[in-house]
Amino acid sequence: MTKRYWNIDLEEMMRAGVHFGHGTRKWNPRMAPYISAKRKGIHIINLTRTARFLSEACDLVFDAASKGKQFLIVGTKNKAADLVSRAAIRARCHYVNKKWLGGMLTNWSTTEKRLHKFRDLRTEQKTEGFNRLPKRDAAVLKRQLSRLKTYLGGIKYMTGLPDIVIIIDQQEEYTALRECITLGIPTISLIDTNCNPDLADISIPANDDAIASIRFTLNKLVFAICEGRSSYIQNS
């Protein structure tokens, strides 16, 4: 994997609050190598380590995107949801930002059936098929469509398992991470000081609660994916 320069600036990270971890009582001792200090009862993340692993993650997604690989971005908590959808749309990635349905990847055949149902209902709606049904039946299908859109809207074009999964907040998305581990799908995970850094393929130590910190990390990864996609288009 070729190393590239991604302009990851320590001062910019500090302004985004990337270095603020959780309270010292809520920490995972395995995070010790990624913590540089304690301040007012809060662990401070070593941004040099953050920059190193974020750069490695950018190299990985660039290389994958330049080969036409598919990405899934997962971040379902309120602070991350909008950032995840915007980032994914910008980089033409799949995303889950509302709720992770158990077995979404490990039980892919069921997910595929749900996606087919979702596409069929969308087609019905677009062709005004609901208007030809009794009101009660139409109402049931509209509710079904609304629910499927909420949970599967970000993966509606996904035709198979993703090649790489990017996880925002490992604790929150633990089920998704375990499914990726079970299937051997490479993962990049944003980890705060209460996480286990040994679970994901690349763990990026960073504040996973601050919107600015999540945005900073996603922006770097999305830029690398977009650069990789441009390279793929030029070479194909």
Curated annotation (Swiss-Prot):
Q: Which NCBIfam families match?
A: rpsB_bact
Name-wise, this protein is: Small ribosomal subunit protein uS2c
Q: Cellular component terms, GO, for this chain's entry?
A: chloroplast; mitochondrial small ribosomal subunit
User: Which is a GO BP term held by this UniProt record?
Assistant: translation
Report the subcellular localization.
Plastid, Chloroplast
The record's section on Gene3D superfamilies has: Glucose-6-phosphate isomerase like protein, domain 1 (3.40.50.10490), Helix hairpin bin (1.10.287.610)
Look up the domain of life of the source: Eukaryota
Task: State the family it belongs to.
Answer: Belongs to the universal ribosomal protein uS2 family.
Keywords of the record, alphabetical order, are: Chloroplast, Plastid, Ribonucleoprotein, Ribosomal protein
GO MF terms listed in the record are:
structural constituent of ribosome
- InterPro entries associated with the record: Ribosomal_uS2 (IPR001865), Ribosomal_uS2_bac/mit/plastid (IPR005706), Ribosomal_uS2_CS (IPR018130), Ribosomal_uS2_flav_dom_sf (IPR023591)
Q: Which CDD domains match?
A: RPS2 (cd01425)
Give the transmembrane ranges.
Answer: none
Q: What is its main location?
A: plastid
Cross-referenced PANTHER family, in alphabetical order?
30S RIBOSOMAL PROTEIN S2 PROKARYOTIC AND ORGANELLAR (PTHR12534), SMALL RIBOSOMAL SUBUNIT PROTEIN US2M (PTHR12534:SF0)
Q: Which Pfam families match?
A: Ribosomal_S2
